[in-house]
Regions:
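Conformational coupling and interaction surfaces
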Residues: 2-7, 25-27, 32-34, 172-174, ...
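Acidic/polar N-terminal loop/beta-strand segments that form early-domain functional surfaces
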Residues: 40-43, 71-73, 269
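Surface-exposed loop and adjacent secondary-structure segments within mature catalytic domains
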Residues: 69-97
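Generic, well-ordered alpha-helical segments
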Residues: 46-50, 84, 105, 240, ...
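Short secondary-structure junction motifs
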Residues: 7, 63-65, 121, 261
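A residue-level signal for conserved active-site and pocket-lining positions in enzyme catalytic cores
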Residues: 68, 181, 248
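Active-site histidine-anchored catalytic micro-motif
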Residues: 2-14, 18-56, 90, 96-203
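A glycine-rich helix N-cap at a beta->alpha junction
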Residues: 57, 61-69
Length: 314
């Protein structure tokens, strides 16, 4: 793990989103993470809604000086797809929060990503936990950023799907963008469904987080109660998976997951497989591995990280 004087600089690109909110809080409360910026994208809800939600989470987290920039409102080529059946009409249903006083910066998310990365020493990690539209657009607009991004830690993909039998939501929403990012040559670590479905908020987890007993933990518990209800109704899951926080947890301490370097390609043409991340688990293609694929989660360490971050946000 990094020492506190070696903070990992990150830009969180998100579509809040219940698990996005928890990911932001995890980063905000950890001394080894420096949030350089938060950028928003359409995904779980329209970008207008995800942007407001990001501002609300920043206020709970005390991120008053972190710029929040609104990004792409639709995929590169396809029609927009959102997930009100999981995240509610607001994109973050459940907790009742006042309108945020924090404002978006005027700069577009894509321009902000480009500016921050080019001005850096090559030490910024991108953490996209929604569709990859903003990241792909930044690479298209300014290819020089590719050599200056330290790493991209993606929540998305998997060896099975949750939007179609083949495709996970974040990749399916904008597979063309995902293909650009996965083929960029930038170091990529993928937190797919194989990993995130191990991050289940059980009743014991919720009880532990509730005992923190501050504004941030109360907010998280309310998120989990709503998220748990929709996951049970939609997928039959007894406990909701907290997908996006896995990406932040890895950035805090990579030992929280076990990874394997594998070949991953994004399908953009298939009639039944659009948006699939084809993970060459057994090396049958003979193609060069290009992604660190997370396969196993240290659940105790993961939830302890979240608890500790919430305690710091009191």
């Amino acid at each position: 793990m990094l020492s506190t004087n070696q903070k990992r600089k990150v830009i969180i690109d998100c579509d809040p989103g219940h698990d996005d909110a928890i990911a932001i809080l995890l980063a905000a409360g950890n001394p080894n993470i420096e949030i350089v910026a938060i950028t928003t994208v359409a995904g779980n809800a329209e970008v207008e809604k995800t942007s407001v939600n990001a501002l609300k989470v920043c206020e709970i987290a005390g991120l008053h000086d972190v710029p929040v920039a609104r990004g792409a409102g639709q995929p590169l080529f396809r029609e927009r797809l959102t997930a009100p059946d999981i995240h509610g009409e607001s994109g973050m249903d459940g907790p009742q929060l006042p309108a945020p006083s924090k404002q978006l910066v005027e700069e577009h998310a894509v321009d902000l990503i480009i500016r921050k990365v080019l001005a850096s020493d090559g030490d910024i990690t991108l953490i996209p936990v929604g569709p990859l539209t903003n990241i792909a657009m930044a690479m298209i607009r300014e290819p020089r950023i590719k050599s200056k991004i330290a790493e991209i830690v993606i929540m998305g993909g998997g060896m099975f799907g949750n939007t179609t039998p083949a495709a996970e939501f974040n990749i399916y929403v904008d597979a063309e963008a995902a293909k650009i990012v996965f083929e960029s040559g930038v170091p990529i670590t993928m937190m797919g469904l194989d990993l995130t479905h191990q991050a289940l908020a059980t009743p014991d987890v919720i009880k532990t987080l509730s005992a923190v007993n501050n504004k941030a933990s109360t907010f998280v518990v309310e998120l989990l109660q709503f998220f748990g209800k929709t996951y049970l109704e939609k997928f039959g899951f007894p406990h909701p998976p907290i997908h996006d926080a896995c990406a932040v947890a890895y950035c805090i301490d990579p030992s929280v997951v076990e990874t394997k370097r594998l070949r991953v390609d994004v399908e953009t043409k298939g009639e039944l497989t659009y948006g699939m991340t084809l993970v060459d688990l057994y090396g049958v293609t003979g193609r060069e591995p290009n992604v660190n694929v997370a396969l196993k989660l240290d659940q105790e360490k993961f939830w302890d990280m979240i608890k500790r971050s919430l305690e710091q946000l009191s």
